[in-house]
Amino acid sequence: MKLVKNAVGRFVPTEVNGETQIPFKGVDKHKPTGVKAKPPIRSCIDYPEDGNKVVKDLKTALKKAGLKDGMTISTHHHLRNGDAVTNMLFDAVKEMRIKNIRWFPTASFPVHSHLIKYLEDGTIHHIEGSMNGPLGKFTTEGKMKGVGVLRSHGGRYAAIQDGEVHIDI
């Protein structure tokens, strides 16, 4: 891993999980280039004629969404420590034999300790977001296959807006 010294004297990696990183150069020393990320334009042709997008189960929904190895899955933290949905989501991902998922949550909670087995077997490659409780301990101990990227709620928004992270599902 190549390290360079940033503007505050810290050595930081030039690449994380295969993606080039720009070290902090100081205030007003770096001007990002590019455009904001944008979602595709949807129209009625993209949906069933009757308007009903409900499918029979989570695996069917993931298949229809085109889930493949290496994609980014984002989840929201509104259910907090009662979030069984994310656990069911990754149970389905595992059953589909999908690997190397980047999980991009707005937050994680102790209930997500269920996902450690998927970090161990490669279903989830790494997490970019908060890593609390047992997940935080697991990642702090260096057990995750990829490098965890700790993002604040606002930092997450900026990464999406600036196109640094593309959410697939």
Regions picked out by a protein language model, each given a short descriptive name:
Residues 2-169:
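Conserved alpha/beta enzyme-core scaffold
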